[in-house]
Amino acid sequence: ASDFVPIDYELDFSRGGDLPPVTVQDDDVTVSLSGKVDRVDGYIQNGRLYLRVMDYKSGKKSFSLSDVWNGLNMQLIIYLYALQTEGLERYRAKLTGELNEIRPAGVLYVPVRDTIPDGERAQDDETLHALRERALRRSGLLSDDIDILEAMEKGLTGEGKFLPVKLKVAKPTKKNPEPTPELAAV
């Protein structure tokens, strides 16, 4: 279960689209970037709308932060940027006028294939179910805010069932005597 709910499907940002294109200017060159977001999920907390971009993939696609750092595979990041910079008025009208700002919650590739997990033929149902869930785990980049992650996946205590995260409890130290959860990339 999740507090994030779908708020847009096939959202077009382009000239004449649902939102304007993303415009990047450098010296005398201006580039307009257009696209269509498969799904946008939102979660409202204290006047802030947290947005998560979902991109459906039928093949195996995984998110690579090094690709983003090298200027490759920027699609989902550009979508989230477009929503954050241009989406406030749209979502005030669509959801509630009480919104003050949009904050990024994450970007995820979502597998949409029926998976047949690798393994032995004679697997019990529980093992098979666990292998299928693992194959359907999303890939992406998420906020490191524990409250936002818990809003994305209720009951998140260790490794995410569908989210690519793992929570660990940090050991108490002299500076911080209380154990605290830490986020680790999976």
Language-model segments: what does each one mean?
Residues 1-186:
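Structural signature of nuclease core domains in nucleic-acid processing machines
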